[in-house]
From Swiss-Prot:
Binding-site residues, Mg(2+): D490, D496
Gene Ontology biological-process annotations: mRNA catabolic process; RNA processing
Principal EC category: transferase
Predominant location category: cytoplasm
The protein's name: Polyribonucleotide nucleotidyltransferase
Function per UniProt: Involved in mRNA degradation. Catalyzes the phosphorolysis of single-stranded polyribonucleotides processively in the 3'- to 5'-direction.
Superkingdom of source: Bacteria
Catalyses which reaction(s): RNA(n+1) + phosphate = RNA(n) + a ribonucleoside 5'-diphosphate
EC number(s) given by UniProt: 2.7.7.8
Cofactors: Mg(2+)
Organism: Staphylococcus epidermidis (strain ATCC 12228 / FDA PCI 1200)
Amino acid sequence: MSQEKKVFKTEWAGRSLTIETGQLAKQANGAVLVRYGDTVVLSTATASKEPRDGDFFPLTVNYEEKMYAAGKIPGGFKKREGRPGDEATLTARLIDRPIRPLFPKGYRHDVQIMNIVLSADPDCSPEMAAMIGSSMALSVSDIPFQGPIAGVNVGYIDGKYVINPSVADKEISRLDLEVAGHKDAVNMVEAGASEITESEMLEAIFFGHEEIKRLVAFQQEIIDHIQPIKQEFVPVERDEDLVEKVKSLTEDKGLKDTVLTFDKQQRDENLDALKEEVVGHFLDEEDPENETLVKEVYAILNDLIKEEVRRLIADEKIRPDGRKVDEIRPLESEVGLLPRAHGSGLFTRGQTQALSVLTLGALGDYQLIDGLGPEVEKRFMHHYNFPNFSVGETGPVRAPGRREIGHGALGERALRYIIPDTQDFPYTIRIVSEVLESNGSSSQASICGSTLALMDAGVPIKAPVAGIAMGLVTRDDSYTILTDIQGMEDALGDMDFKVAGTKDGITAIQMDIKIDGLTREVIEEALEQARQGRLAIMDHMLHTIEQPREELSAYAPKVVTMSINPDKIRDVIGPGGKKINEIIDETGVKLDIEQDGTIFIGAVDQAMINRAKEIIEDITREAEVGQVYHAKVKRIEKYGAFVELFPGKDALLHISQISQERINKVEDVLKIGDTIEVKITEIDKQGRVNASHKVLEQSKN
C-alpha cells in the first residue's frame, strides 16, 4: 500500500465526499479514510498470508460504531463499547453481501474488513460511507478483488426518488432502500417500504444504480492513480482424469435420480450414500488415510451434484422435489395454538415451518435504541430463532448470531408498515418466530407466521403481509427464475431474492446473489413472479383467519387512554415520582405519560385500571364554580374551615358562609373530619377556591 498521503474529492448527494489514502493504518493490506460531510469512517482490509483449508471463502466484515463519534459516553458500568449492537451487525451484513461475490473463485485466504466510525453526521450515512470505504480499502490493497462497488440509500418522497435522504426526509419517505452494485449491474438490494408497487421499486433500484455507476467511476480514477499491485492468485486446477472417472461413477450410480428426491432428509441420505460409494472406489487399502485424494473426490462430487441440480433446472425445468419453476410448496397454517400466549400462528411451507408467538405489553415496555443518532423508542420487535433441531442437527446453544439478527430485522421491516399507530393501538408488540423445520425460505415463513399471530392477537393491522423467496439459475446465456426456493436451490443457485408485501405492494425486499450482478430484465421478472407467489400465499393465509380478531386475549393487558391538563403531569408524578409509584403499588398497573398529557393505563385486571383512572382523575380534577361537593373538613381557623373537595384540592369555607345563622366560633358547628356539602362560589386569579354551605341552605329554603 502507498505510504504517501493522497486525497481525492467529489460530491455525493449534495455533500462533499473525500477519500484519503496513505496516512492511516499503513500495516493493513489496504486502508482508506472516508469523509462524507461530517461523517468520518476508517476502512481497512487485511488478508492472511496462507489460505485456509475448506471449501468456503473466509470473509469477515466488521462495522464498529464508536460512541465518541457522536459525542457520547457509553452507558453501563464499564463505560466502554461492548459487542456490536443489532444495527451495527446489520450494517456489516449489508457491506458483506455486495463484496463477497467479487473475489476470485477458489480464493481461500482469510480476509477481514474493518470499518470504524470516527465521526457521525446522521444526515451523511456512516453505513454508506463504510460501504465505499470497504470497496476502496480492498481496491487499493494487494488483495485480489474484482470491484470496485458502491452503495446508496434511496428514498421516495412526493413521487420523487432521493439519493441519501436526510433523517428528516426519511421520516416522510415511503421507501428506505439500500442498493449496491458495480458499473455493470446491481448485486445487493435491501429495502423496507410502505406498499411500494413493483414498478416503483424497480425504478428506485435503477435510479440508485445510476448514482452507483458515478461513484464507481470516481473510485476507478483513484485506483488508476494509485495503481496497486495485486497478489497473484492461481486457482487450483482439478485433475481432469480424476474428474472424468468420478463423473462416470456418479452416472452409473444414478446421480439424477438421487437428486430428484422429494423429501429433503431422504435426498441428503441418498446423496451421502452415493458419495460414500464413489469414494470407496478410491480408497487404498494399504493407505486408508489418503486424505488428499479423498478430499479431492468429495470436492469433485460436490461440484458434480451442483452442476446436475443446475442442469436439471435450466435445461429440463425440473426441480429437486419435482416442482415446476413457478410452483409453491404445499401450504398449511393454523392460529391460536398457545392458549396463554396473546397471539400465535403456525405457518408451514413444504418442509419449512415457523411458529410465531406474539406478546402485548404496555408502551413503557419499548426497547430503547441508543446508537450514534438520537435515542429511539422501539415499540414493535420481531425476533427470529433458528435452533439446531430445525435441520436435524445437534450443537451448542448460543446467543443469536448474525443470521438470526438479520432474518429477525427483515421480518420486522416487512411488518413495520402495517402496525397500527400508538393512538389507535397503545401497546408494545413483540413477536418471536421459532423456526421448527427448515428447508429454505425460513425468514419468509416467519413473516407469514407473524402476520397470522398479529391477526390472532386482535392487532388491527392495516393489511396482512406474506413473504416469498425467489431463486435464480443462470446457464450460458439463459436464466431460470424459481418461485419459493428450498435449501438446495438456495445453496446451489445464483440468487436468494426475498420479497414481502401486502396485496397492494411491497413492504420489504432483500437480495443476495453469488454472481457478478443482475440486469434490469431479471429483477423485473423476479419481482413480478414474486408478486404472483405472494398473492397465492396470502389467499391461503386468509382462509385460515380472514381478519384480526375483534377482542384481545383474556390474558393480554388492557390499555385505557385518558387525557389530562399537561400542567397537571407533575401532580400525577409527584415529588421524586412518589405519587405515580403509589398508584402503581396500589393498583399494579403500568402507566405511561406523554408530554401532551395523554396517559396510557395498562393491566390485565379491568378493575385495577378503573381504580388507577379514578385516582388520577381525583389528582387532576379541576374545581368549577357552581359545582357542589361533599367536602371533608381538614383544618379549622378563626376565620373559617379548609375543606377537601377531592384529593389534592382544598377550598376555604369562610365562617360567614357556614350557616344562615350567625356563628361565633367555627368549632361550634364543625370539627376536623366532618363531611359537609359545599358549593364553589369563586376561584380567584391565583387559583384559590372559596366555597359556601349557606347558599345551599338558602336554595333549599
